[in-house]
């Protein structure tokens, strides 16, 4: 791809040795780096911010949402949610929060709960989601913005796509840029 776009093929490099001393030394190479964009959990992001001597674009921790609209194929939605939540729980792009249109909550949530039982996923939700499925326990205010990295899923029921967008925008991870102080 680099060659096709007439970009130097050495512009992208892979460091195969993941030893912390090597990666920390790499983060200090102003002669090779213009910016770092760490993707991972809070510990990785904090380590890059604390050790880098080049600017860092902090992506924040992951609080990935899935919105299921009233027009969705429910079987497909269950499969997507199951995969996104349980395939690799410890990655920053794992689903942590589910937002569901109120018109499908009664059909979707019990079906989803049965599937998530295969992996013992704990479901934490608002009153509307609890009314639709007895397996859902109450969510706290902290649950909406939490990166669990665990078999836990928060669930919010909404009345419109606009309300879903507002909820997601309120609770997704923040992004900011840090300039090194050293």
Regions of interest found by a model, annotated:
Residues 30, 92, 170-173:
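Alpha-helix termination/capping residues and helix-transition junctions
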Residues 44-150:
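ALDH superfamily catalytic-core signature
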Residues 175-181:
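Residue-level detector of conserved catalytic or cofactor/ligand-binding positions
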Residues 145-152, 171-175:
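Conserved glycine-rich beta-strand-loop-beta hairpin in the small C-terminal domain of fold type I
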Residues 167-169, 182:
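Mature, solvent-exposed C-terminal subdomains and processed small-chain segments of exported/organellar
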Residues 36, 101, 164:
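Residue-level signal for inorganic ion chemistry
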Residues 160-161:
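Catalytic core of tubulin tyrosine ligase-like
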Residues 1-71:
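Rossmann-like NAD(P) dinucleotide-binding subdomain of oxidoreductase/dehydrogenase enzymes
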């Amino acid at each position: 791809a680099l060659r096709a776009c007439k970009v130097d093929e050495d512009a992208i490099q892979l460091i195969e040795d993941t030893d912390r001393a090597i990666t920390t030394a790499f983060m200090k190479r102003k002669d090779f780096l213009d910016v770092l964009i760490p993707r991972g959990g809070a510990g990785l992001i904090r380590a890059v911010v604390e050790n880098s001597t080049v600017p860092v674009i902090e992506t924040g921790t992951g609080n990935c949402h899935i919105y299921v609209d009233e027009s969705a194929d429910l079987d497909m939605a269950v499969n997507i949610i199951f995969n996104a939540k349980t395939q690799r729980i410890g990655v920053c792009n794992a689903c942590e929060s589910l937002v569901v249109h109120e018109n499908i909550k009664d059909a979707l949530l019990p079906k989803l709960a049965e599937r998530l039982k295969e992996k013992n996923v704990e479901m934490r939700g608002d009153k509307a989601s609890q009314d639709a499925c007895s397996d859902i326990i109450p969510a706290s205010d902290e649950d909406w913005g939490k990166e669990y990295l665990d078999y836990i899923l928060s669930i919010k029921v909404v009345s419109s796509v606009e309300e879903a967008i507002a909820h997601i925008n309120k609770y997704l991870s923040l992004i900011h840029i840090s300039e090194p102080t050293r």
